[in-house]
């Protein structure tokens, strides 16, 4: 009888402890529950089975495999234009390295200037100079072992002046995206832009002549209305068709085999079903991404939403054997917008890694990328600003990875 009473008391005590832990929403301690062992079909031998490109170079295969595995334990930290965008135009090392002493694990670049109508590929041309700088940065990053990712703020096909719909007429907005589809009035124009992209990617080479892998995320943030490829200006099927055409043209027509392709809407989707509304298919996507600024600038409710969306993303990626990533995020500090206390080390870190529901569905976000710093504002604090220690603490946590704790991403494990 005493044993029975003792067992009941012990059981009640355990329930109370678990209830107290699960309701402690304000705790800033790191989650100490280790993720369960993942039953993942991905191996070093079958990696091509789950990739877009069955002819991907061995370095590109290794990047896919290592990114997928990295997300099980750590999240690589990076920044757009990290080598050239500095707060207060300080120059020198990246602001990440100024703060932490280490290079970023991810470098973001863009094809915008590379495909600009004014790029005449002459050495005295400003746009061509930007192309050369970007190529140089990508090569330097690869030589260090940094992951390279590209977005593409492609200017509209009529005047090629802007990628924002705010700068376009109603007629341009309603026809621009459809015009680049096969059979459209601007499909040849679009193919020429892709020719330029293919030429640059095909000439990204390491010291031994090997092709440098990149992650490419065309038509990003498509669920918004600020870009001319946004959801208001094309149907889901038209979006899929354009994405598929882009991949097929680069991979099959141009023979480019050093790309991982990323699908990256903004933060409007909270269910897998909605997230996949414009998904072009597993044969066309390697990375399931999401850009999310809004939720991470909206207080505790926003952090909870962001965490739930990354969990949704992780589940979708696990099901499809794809890579999950927070492809853009950040909170910009300016003269009129002060830092948020512990935004990096507590709020963002818990968004990336927390599992307060104890449902054994853990986030597996392989990388997070902050937007670029400028003269007048920053997303990543350098070593001199008031929240520098907050970022450094974030970067030094057990599930964060700068370059110093990144595995060899371009070599398959033995």
Feature-to-residue mapping (PLM):
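Sec-dependent bacterial lipoprotein signal peptides
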Residues: 1-19
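Boundary/entry segment of secreted carbohydrate-active catalytic domains
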Residues: 35-113
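Glycoside hydrolase catalytic-domain groove-lining segments
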Residues: 278-336
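Bacterial Sec-dependent N-terminal signal peptides
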Residues: 18-44
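Aromatic-lined carbohydrate-recognition surfaces of secreted/lumenal glycan-active proteins
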Residues: 77-80, 213, 217-219, 243-273, ...
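Substrate-binding cleft of extracellular glycoside hydrolase catalytic domains
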Residues: 116-252, 256
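Alpha-helical scaffolding within the catalytic cores
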Residues: 62, 88-96, 132-135, 199-200, ...
């Amino acid at each position: 009888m005493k044993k029975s009473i003792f067992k009941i008391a012990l059981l009640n005590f355990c329930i109370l402890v678990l209830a107290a832990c699960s309701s402690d929403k304000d705790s800033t301690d790191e989650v100490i529950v280790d993720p369960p062992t993942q039953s993942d079909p991905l191996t070093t031998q079958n990696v091509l089975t789950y990739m877009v490109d069955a002819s991907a170079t061995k370095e590109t295969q290794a990047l896919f495999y290592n990114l997928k595995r990295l997300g099980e334990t750590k999240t690589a930290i990076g920044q757009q234009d990290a080598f050239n965008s500095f707060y207060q135009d300080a120059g020198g090392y990246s602001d990440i390295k100024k703060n932490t002493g280490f290079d970023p694990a991810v470098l973001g670049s863009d094809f915008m200037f590379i495909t600009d109508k004014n790029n005449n590929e002459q050495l005295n041309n400003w746009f061509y100079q930007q192309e050369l700088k970007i190529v140089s940065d990508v090569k330097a990053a690869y030589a260090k072992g940094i992951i390279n990712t590209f977005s593409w703020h492609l200017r509209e096909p009529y005047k090629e002046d802007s990628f924002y719909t705010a700068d376009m007429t109603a007629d341009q907005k309603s026809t621009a995206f459809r015009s680049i589809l096969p059979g459209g009035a601007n499909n040849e124009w679009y193919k020429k832009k892709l020719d330029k992209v293919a030429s640059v990617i095909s000439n990204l080479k390491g010291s031994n002549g090997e092709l440098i892998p990149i992650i490419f995320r065309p038509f990003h943030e498509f669920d918004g209305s600020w870009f001319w490829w946004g959801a208001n200006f094309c149907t889901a099927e038209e979006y899929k068709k354009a994405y598929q055409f882009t991949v097929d043209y680069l991979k099959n027509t141009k023979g480019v085999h050093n790309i991982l392709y990323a699908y990256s809407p903004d933060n409007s989707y909270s269910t897998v079903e909605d997230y996949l509304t414009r998904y072009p298919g597993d044969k066309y996507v390697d990375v399931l991404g999401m850009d999310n600024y809004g939720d991470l600038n909206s207080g505790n409710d926003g952090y909870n939403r962001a965490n739930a969306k990354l969990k949704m993303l992780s589940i979708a990626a696990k099901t499809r054997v794809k890579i999950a990533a927070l492809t853009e995020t950040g909170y910009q500090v300016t003269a009129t917008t002060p830092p948020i206390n512990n935004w990096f080390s507590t709020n963002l870190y818990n968004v990336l890694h927390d599992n307060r529901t104890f449902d054994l569905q853990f986030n597996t976000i392989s990388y997070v990328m902050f937007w670029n710093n400028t003269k007048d504002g920053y997303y990543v604090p350098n070593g001199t600003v008031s929240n520098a220690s907050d970022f450094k603490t974030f970067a030094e946590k057990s599930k964060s990875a700068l370059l110093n704790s990144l595995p060899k991403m371009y070599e398959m494990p033995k």
